[in-house]
C-alpha cells in the first residue's frame, strides 16, 4: 500500500473519528475558554500544508539546510507582517509556544540564579513567570508581586517596593488571568529604577494591543512575548518582539541554537496568514466586539448576583469569584461543561483552595465573538451560566438544570454555524 496517497479516513479511522467528533463539539458548545479561539480556513490550510515536510534550522538566508527558498519567503512574510502589526523593529516568529518564547528571553538575558520579579500565580500570573513547579521557578530566584487585597488591581507600589528590595535582573509585566489594563509605562519606570530588563508578556491581550485597544508595551518594554493564538486568532505558537535590535540578536541566538532546533515551517506559514488577517480593517472591529461582549457578560452575571473580580473587565476576560456562593471553581466548570458551556476553573487572588479545585471560574469572549456573537447573545449566555450556578447553590445534583440549559445552548448554536 502506498501510504502517501491515503487520506486520513483510509489510513487511520480512529483519529478521523476523533477529529470529526471534536469538530461536532466545537460547533455545538459555547466556548468561553479565554485562551481559545477559532482559526480561519485559510490558517488551517496553511497549517496542514506540505511545508510540514521541510527542515529549516536557522533563519532566512542563514539556514543549515538547502532547499529553503520557499520557506524563507514564508518566514520573512510572517516577520514583516507582525512588525507592521505592532509597529516594532524586531520580531522572531519561531517559538513553538508562548512558554518557549518566555524561556528564550530568560536564556538570552539572564544567568541561572538571577532574580526575576513577576505576578504571583494566584493574582493572575502565568506559570512561566516564576512559579515554583515551572523551570522559571527552578532556575531563577523568583519573587512575586500581587494585586491589592481590596481592589484586586496590580499594586504598583508593592511592585516598586519589591524591586528595590530584591534588585531583579528581569521584571515581568503580564498575566494569564487579569481583567484590567496594565500600565507598561509604570513598569518601565520601576525597571529603570533598579536597572532591570522589562519583559511584557501580552499573550492574552496581543490583539488588543495590535488594534490600539490597550497601551502598547513596545515603547516601554525591552522585549515583548506573546502567543499567536488567543486574541491574535492564529495557530498555536509564540513570538518575540522588540524595538532593541541588539537584544534581538541575543534572542535569535538564544532561541536557535540555544533552545529549539528546526522551526515548524507549516506553523510559521499559518502565522503569516493570521497576521495578514489581523492587518485587515475588520480585525479592529472584531477586537472592539470582543471587549464589548466581555463587558456585557460581566454585567449580566452581576445582575444575577455574582461577584465579578475587580467589578468588571477592560479586556476579553471575566473572572467570577464564587467564594460567597459556596461553589468551587472545579464544580462550576464541570457542571457548565455538561450543559454545553466550556470554561475553566481558576484561582482568584489570595485563594486558599487547591489550584486543582479553586474558588473561581474564568470566561473569555474571543472564540464566540469569532462565530459572530454580539452583546445580546452574551447577556443570554450570562443568564445561562447563572442558571447553572444557581442550581449548584441549592442542589448537589444539578442534572435537570444542566439538561435544560444544554437544550438552550443547542438552539443558540444552530444560529452560529462555523466549520462546515
Swiss-Prot record:
Subcellular localization, as worded in the UniProt entry: Cytoplasm
GO BP field: glycine biosynthetic process from serine; tetrahydrofolate interconversion
Enzyme Commission number, as recorded: 2.1.2.1
GO molecular function, one term: pyridoxal phosphate binding
Stored CDD domains: SHMT
Superkingdom: Bacteria
Enzyme class: transferase
A GO cellular-component term linked to this record: cytosol
Reported cofactor(s): pyridoxal 5'-phosphate
Catalytic activity: (6R)-5,10-methylene-5,6,7,8-tetrahydrofolate + glycine + H2O = (6S)-5,6,7,8-tetrahydrofolate + L-serine
Function as written in the Swiss-Prot or TrEMBL entry: Catalyzes the reversible interconversion of serine and glycine with tetrahydrofolate (THF) serving as the one-carbon carrier. This reaction serves as the major source of one-carbon groups required for the biosynthesis of purines, thymidylate, methionine, and other important biomolecules. Also exhibits THF-independent aldolase activity toward beta-hydroxyamino acids, producing glycine and aldehydes, via a retro-aldol mechanism.
Protein known as: Serine hydroxymethyltransferase
Organism, scientific name: Rickettsia prowazekii (strain Madrid E)
Lineage of origin: Bacteria, Pseudomonadati, Pseudomonadota, Alphaproteobacteria, Rickettsiales
Name of the gene encoding the protein in the UniProt record: glyA
Amino acid at each position: 500500500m502506498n501510504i502517501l496517497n491515503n487520506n486520513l479516513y483510509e489510513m487511520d479511522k480512529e483519529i478521523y473519528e476523533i477529529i470529526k467528533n471534536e469538530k461536532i463539539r466545537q460547533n455545538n458548545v459555547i466556548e468561553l475558554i479565554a485562551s481559545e479561539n477559532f482559526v480561519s480556513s485559510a490558517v488551517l490550510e496553511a497549517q496542514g500544508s506540505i511545508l510540514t515536510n521541510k527542515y529549516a534550522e536557522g533563519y532566512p538566508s542563514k539556514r543549515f539546510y538547502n532547499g529553503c527558498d520557499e520557506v524563507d519567503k514564508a518566514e520573512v512574510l510572517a516577520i514583516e507582517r507582525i512588525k507592521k502589526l505592532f509597529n516594532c523593529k524586531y520580531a522572531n516568529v519561531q517559538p513553538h509556544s508562548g512558554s518557549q518564547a518566555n524561556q528564550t528571553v530568560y536564556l538570552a538575558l539572564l544567568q541561572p540564579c538571577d532574580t526575576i520579579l513577576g505576578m504571583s500565580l494566584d493574582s493572575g500570573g502565568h506559570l512561566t513567570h516564576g512559579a515554583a513547579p515551572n523551570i522559571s521557578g527552578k532556575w531563577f530566584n523568583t519573587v512575586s508581586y500581587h494585586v491589592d487585597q481590596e481592589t484586586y488591581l496590580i499594586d504598583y507600589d508593592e511592585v516598586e517596593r519589591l524591586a528595590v528590595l530584591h534588585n531583579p535582573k528581569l521584571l515581568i509585566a503580564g498575566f494569564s488571568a487579569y481583567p484590567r489594563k496594565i500600565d507598561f509605562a509604570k513598569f518601565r519606570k520601576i525597571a529603570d529604577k533598579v536597572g532591570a530588563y522589562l519583559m511584557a508578556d501580552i499573550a492574552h491581550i496581543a490583539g488588543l494591543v495590535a488594534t490600539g485597544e490597550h497601551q502598547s508595551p513596545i515603547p516601554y518594554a525591552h522585549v515583548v512575548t506573546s502567543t499567536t493564538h488567543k486574541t491574535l486568532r492564529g495557530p498555536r505558537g509564540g513570538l518575540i518582539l522588540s524595538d532593541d535590535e541588539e537584544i534581538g540578536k541575543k534572542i535569535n541566538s538564544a532561541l536557535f541554537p540555544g533552545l529549539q532546533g528546526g522551526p515548524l515551517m507549516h506553523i510559521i506559514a499559518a502565522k503569516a496568514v493570521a497576521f495578514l488577517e489581523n492587518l485587515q480593517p475588520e480585525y479592529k472591529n472584531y477586537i472592539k466586539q470582543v471587549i464589548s461582549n466581555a463587558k456585557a457578560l460581566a454585567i449580566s452575571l452581576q445582575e444575577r448576583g455574582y461577584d465579578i473580580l475587580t467589578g468588571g473587565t477592560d479586556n476579553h476576560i471575566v473572572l467570577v469569584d464564587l467564594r460567597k456562593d459556596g461553589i468551587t471553581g472545579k464544580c462550576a466548570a464541570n457542571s457548565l461543561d455538561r450543559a454545553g458551556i466550556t470554561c475553566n476553573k481558576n484561582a482568584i487572588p489570595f485563594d486558599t483552595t487547591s489550584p486543582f479545585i479553586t474558588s473561581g471560574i474564568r470566561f473569555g469572549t474571543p472564540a464566540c465573538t469569532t462565530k459572530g456573537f454580539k452583546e445580546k447573545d452574551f447577556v443570554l449566555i450570562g443568564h445561562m451560566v447563572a442558571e447553572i450556578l444557581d442550581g449548584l447553590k441549592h442542589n448537589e445534583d444539578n442534572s435537570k438544570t444542566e439538561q435544560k440549559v444544554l437544550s438552550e445552548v443547542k438552539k443558540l448554536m444552530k444560529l452560529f454555524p462555523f466549520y462546515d
